[in-house]
Regions:
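Secretory targeting signals
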Residues: 26-78, 82, 139-219, 240-320, ...
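Alpha-helical transmembrane segments of multi-pass membrane transporters/translocases
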Residues: 17-20, 306-314, 371-417
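Aromatic- and glycine-rich beta-strand/loop motifs that create alpha-glucan
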Residues: 1-21
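Hydrophobic transmembrane alpha-helix segments characteristic of membrane transport
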Residues: 219-226
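Short helix-to-coil transition segments within interhelical loops
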Residues: 229-235
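Central hydrophobic cores of alpha-helical transmembrane segments
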Residues: 21-25, 325-338
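Juxtamembrane non-transmembrane "cap" segments at the membrane-aqueous interface
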Residues: 268-277, 346-372
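N-terminal, intrinsically disordered, polar/charged segments of Gram-positive cell-envelope systems
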Residues: 38-135
Length: 417
């Protein structure tokens, strides 16, 4: 315990660690606030002039006129009728033909509902969504019964022809059956906000990788490790203390910043929106059985598992590195490696590789969030595996394996010494 406290104090007292932790906390607040600036609202004032709002003011304006609560087929029909009435009034063929102030006054509250209805009734062979005037009141009454059919067509469009396609279809339908219907909705947290949670996870991983990289390598660079390895407690006990201290500091920083992001985001957008079904944010056939609020916490915990696996890899690299530069280079490359593999290596091999390397699931377009809301499957031996499930199931295995390799590598140095 004394070694652990000393190592914790040593790492925390370095100027670089303090700076990086401060940057991480600032990033958490900034990443929560930026999506707020994307929200807009336009209306006419008492004189008939257009007045536009952005940010918090726009959010409050939208919330004053929103549709909220359980979205029943009757509410869906009400939304369609409002849209079609305005479309006829302005002889519109698309939303661009509607005056901006009319859109915000008459239609903005119904937009998520109508957009999801268009997606639900998209052509099963082409995926093309119908226009507003192509939908009927009967369609709205059948909205929820249409969703399994839409899911089946989406899986067919994206996965047909692959070995194990039928199993992928069955997995998707089983997951979607667990989604609570009818959906609930309240304007607030946006898809952009969830994107920024993913970006924050990537940035925090980069910062914490920089903190963890020198934990062992700095002693190797200065020669202090040669002395430590010859002491009574310089073997496994010291290695365990260093590993525990590094995990404690980076883990606490990640969780603190993640919680700050959630609290600030919900305070800005409104806590009511945490009850919104995630299907309104991403896709009407998203397989996740969560509300937005639940999704925020699920993503924090899920990304934390992957983050821990990456930190374990960085610490293993630090054990074998002879100087800080080597350890830092390996750490930074390993964080972005899944994104590079995802973009460069084609086919099933690239998908498996980007999933199984330590930081798999951390990144941008390859991030865990998009695997959870999408329909990405991995195939092997005629079997299909939901990629998000593989990412989460493999993370604890990676952690145990990499921590074990780090300890083994340090013990090998002890024997040599």
């Amino acid at each position: 315990m004394n070694l652990y406290r000393l190592e914790l104090k040593r790492v925390c007292k370095t100027r670089m660690t303090a700076i990086l932790l401060a940057i991480a906390l600032v990033l958490a607040v900034v990443m929560a606030y930026l999506p707020v600036t994307f929200i807009g609202w336009t209306e006419l004032d008492a004189s008939g002039n257009k007045v536009s709002y952005t940010g918090l003011k726009a959010i409050r304006k939208r919330q004053e006129q929103q549709v909220f609560g359980t979205i029943t087929p009757d509410v869906m029909q009400e939304a369609l009728e409002a849209y079609q009435r305005v479309y006829r009034q302005y002889d519109a063929s698309s939303i661009n033909d509607i005056p901006v102030e009319v859109f915000y006054k008459e239609l903005a509250r119904y937009q998520p509902l109508v957009n999801n209805a268009k997606e639900a009734f998209a052509d099963p062979k082409t995926g093309m969504a119908p226009g507003v005037m192509g939908l009927t009141a009967e369609d709205m009454q059948n909205f929820y019964s249409q969703l399994p059919k839409r899911l089946e067509s989406v899986i067919w469009l994206e996965q047909s022809g692959k070995p194990g396609y039928e199993q992928a279809q069955a997995i998707a339908q089983k997951k979607f059956d667990a989604v609570q219907k009818p959906f609930t909705y309240s304007f607030g947290v946006s898809p952009d906000a969830m994107d920024y949670q993913t970006l924050l996870s990537l940035l925090l991983t980069l910062l914490c990788a920089v903190i963890a990289a020198p934990v062992f390598a700095s002693d190797a660079q200065t020669g202090a490790q040669d002395i430590q390895l010859c002491t009574k407690n310089g073997g496994l006990r010291l290695a365990a203390a260093k590993l525990a201290a590094a995990f404690s500091i980076t883990g606490a920083a990640y969780l603190l910043c993640g919680v700050v992001w959630i609290l600030v985001t919900n305070a800005l957008f409104g806590w009511e929106s945490t009850q919104t079904s995630v299907q309104w944010l991403f896709s009407v056939t998203s397989l996740l059985p969560y509300t937005v609020g639940q999704m925020e916490w699920v993503m924090l915990v899920a990304n934390f598992l992957i983050f821990f696996a990456e930190v374990a890899f960085v610490l293993m690299a630090s054990v074998w590195a002879k100087n800080n530069l080597t350890a830092l280079s390996v750490a930074l490359i390993s964080v972005v490696a899944p994104l590079i593999v995802y973009m460069v290596v084609p086919g099933s091999f690239g998908e498996w590789l980007s999933t199984l390397i330590p930081a798999g699931g951390i990144g941008l377009s390859n991030a865990l969030l998009y695997k959870m809301i999408g329909f990405d499957f991995l195939y092997a031996g005629g079997y299909a595996f939901f990629q998000a499930d593989v990412l989460l199931a493999s993370a604890p295995i990676k952690i145990v394996l990499l921590v074990g390799l780090a300890a083994w590598g340090y013990l090998r140095k002890t024997r040599v010494a």
